[in-house]
């Protein structure tokens, strides 16, 4: 693998120390509260295809992917079948095709491969590169995950390789910032078992108002202001 990507692929050298060597997981371990997204249980493991994860900048997409890599290793996926690349270091689709071809050739031939291309929209004409790789049959046995913050570009590019996404029922994912309910759960101020029936009913009522009534909700909790606006059912 290109040495530029080594800091994000320390699992190839020492999978048992991935949590300590990876920059994102190391930073995550220092935080007092760590959120585990439900997407970790929804991302593909068995079906090859081209998948996307969209979301705003700094919402945690890269950290989510590193958690997913660690989870794959924990589930006894061979580390050599997992690779992470970032589009910030790839100039154009020509470089992308060469790099991914080399990475896939270095992986074991048998079994499913897991390839992550983070911040794909940094790469000029990235969709041309992905289309070529798919048409050349190089992605037939690959769970290929692309991420990006520019939803318009990603949505437009998805249309350029229809029929090449794979057989999974779901191929597109979106990572949202934590909402108020998730923040409260993360704070561990209550559990569903310990909460009184009154509080549970109140919480359900609050969520219904938040979802169905299309207005701004402002809550002040623990000196933090939470603002939420919704015009559609989430």
Where are these regions (language model features)?
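Hydrophobic anchor at the beta1->P-loop junction of P-loop NTPases
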Residues: 53
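Interdomain motor-coupling "hinge/lid" segment immediately C-terminal to the ATP-binding subdomain
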Residues: 2, 154-234
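Conserved lysine of the Walker
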Residues: 61
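Conserved P-loop NTPase "ATPase switch" module shared by AAA+ and STAND
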Residues: 108-130
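Short glycine-rich substrate-engagement loop in P-loop NTPases that contacts/grips substrate
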Residues: 81-110
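N-terminal pre-Walker A segment at the start of P-loop NTPase domains
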Residues: 1-44
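Sensor-1/coupling segment of RecA-like P-loop NTPase cores
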Residues: 136-161
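Hydrophobic positions on the alpha1 helix immediately C-terminal to the Walker A/P-loop
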Residues: 64
């Amino acid at each position: 693998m290109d040495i530029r990507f080594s800091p994000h692929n320390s699992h190839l050298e020492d999978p048992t120390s991935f949590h300590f060597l990876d920059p994102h997981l190391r930073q995550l371990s220092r935080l007092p509260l760590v959120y585990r997204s439900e997407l970790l249980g929804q991302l593909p493991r068995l079906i090859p295809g081209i998948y996307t994860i969209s979301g705003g900048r700094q919402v945690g997409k890269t950290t989510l992917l590193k958690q997913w890599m660690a989870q794959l290793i924990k589930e006894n996926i061979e580390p050599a079948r997992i690779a992470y690349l970032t589009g910030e270091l790839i100039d154009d689709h020509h470089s992308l095709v060469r790099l991914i071809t080399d990475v896939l050739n270095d992986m074991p031939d048998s079994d499913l491969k897991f390839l992550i291309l983070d911040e794909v929209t940094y790469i000029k004409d990235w969709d041309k590169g992905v289309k070529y790789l798919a048409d050349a049959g190089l992605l037939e046995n690959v769970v290929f995950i692309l991420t990006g913050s520019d939803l318009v570009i990603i949505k437009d590019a998805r249309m350029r390789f229809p029929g090449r996404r794979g057989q999974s029922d779901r191929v597109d994912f979106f990572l949202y910032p934590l909402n108020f309910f998730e923040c409260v759960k993360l704070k561990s101020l209550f559990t569903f078992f310990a909460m009184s029936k009154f509080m549970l009913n109140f919480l359900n009522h609050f969520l219904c108002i938040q979802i169905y009534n299309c207005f701004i909700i402002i809550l002040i909790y623990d000196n933090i202001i939470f603002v939420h606006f919704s015009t559609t059912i989430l």
